[in-house]
């Protein structure tokens, strides 16, 4: 059996999580069209009879504005250490500019084999894709190949998976074959809730939100009770998330509940509360402990 750890590197919103979801054939990682959706380092495990790949999905590498952003970048860079392969993802719409070269520098410093991935090729013409291909070829050291993909359409995904497997060594099975992530249910539930907030709110609001699961308990009737606090920076943001007559929080709750029910295979009662925690994105205790980034910073 071939096995190994494969990290994804790229600036925010290039489609790293969508690529992993497309490869494993199911939605494990939350996605949205807004940058910096992924905050924590997440392992997604893809096992067949022939291989086990542990995808290490990371926050986008960017110039941070808050302490939260600093920790996100540290988590992403930390994930590049000690892996067997890196997928360096570029958005075909954006091309290769200063932010991409910022990512390339970190990847090159790792001295790890990498595969260049040009994602969202369905949104640009072939000439631009070829230009990006050449820029990646000339910029990425230890590059074993470049694959053109559209994660949303599934284009290039099989070719990418084949190239990943080709570049892994024979090794042990690290996780049980039925395990798809090393994150607990509390983390997955909080991510699903946060994804729905990203889908329904705009501008600064989604980036100002932290979701903390306070309680998970199976009730006597077999329903899984989940109580979650949604923290925001300001009262105005609280009002937006609650919505007129509570319509927004109701929509977020209904959509999140359905997805969590699909995840656990049973009924869920989702109890959401919105609270103001002023300037939480600059408070180390909250970032490291309550939203769980302390473990993400370990090498």
UniProtKB/Swiss-Prot annotation:
Residue span of region G2: 36-40
Please name the GO terms that the record assigns under molecular function.
GTP binding; GTPase activity; ribosomal small subunit binding; small ribosomal subunit rRNA binding
In this chain, the stretch annotated as G4 covers 119-122
Stretches for region G5: 149-151
Tell me the membrane topology, using the record's own terms: Peripheral membrane protein
In this chain the KH type-2 domain maps to 193-278
GO cellular component terms?
cytosol; plasma membrane
Write out the ranges of the annotated region (G3). Answer: 57-60
Q: Where is this region: G1?
A: 10-17
The entry's keywords? Cell inner membrane, Cell membrane, Cytoplasm, GTP-binding, Membrane, Nucleotide-binding, Ribosome biogenesis, RNA-binding, rRNA-binding
Instruction: Return the InterPro entries for the record.
Output: G_ERA_dom, GTP-bd, GTPase_Era-like, KH_dom-like_a/b, KH_dom_type_2, KH_sf_prok-type, P-loop_NTPase, Small_GTP-bd
- According to the entry, every stretch annotated as the Era-type G domain falls at 2-170
One GO biological-process annotation of the entry reads:
ribosomal small subunit assembly
Q: Where in the cell is it found?
A: Cytoplasm; Cell inner membrane
Q: Which PROSITE patterns match?
A: G_ERA, KH_TYPE_2
Similarity-based family = Belongs to the TRAFAC class TrmE-Era-EngA-EngB-Septin-like GTPase superfamily. Era GTPase family.
Tell me, how does this one assemble? Monomer.
Biological role? An essential GTPase that binds both GDP and GTP, with rapid nucleotide exchange. Plays a role in 16S rRNA processing and 30S ribosomal subunit biogenesis and possibly also in cell cycle regulation and energy metabolism.
**Entry-linked HAMAP family:** GTPase_Era
* PANTHER family the record matches: GTPASE ERA, GTPASE ERA, MITOCHONDRIAL
User: In its UniProt entry, what is this protein called?
Assistant: GTPase Era
The gene designation is: era
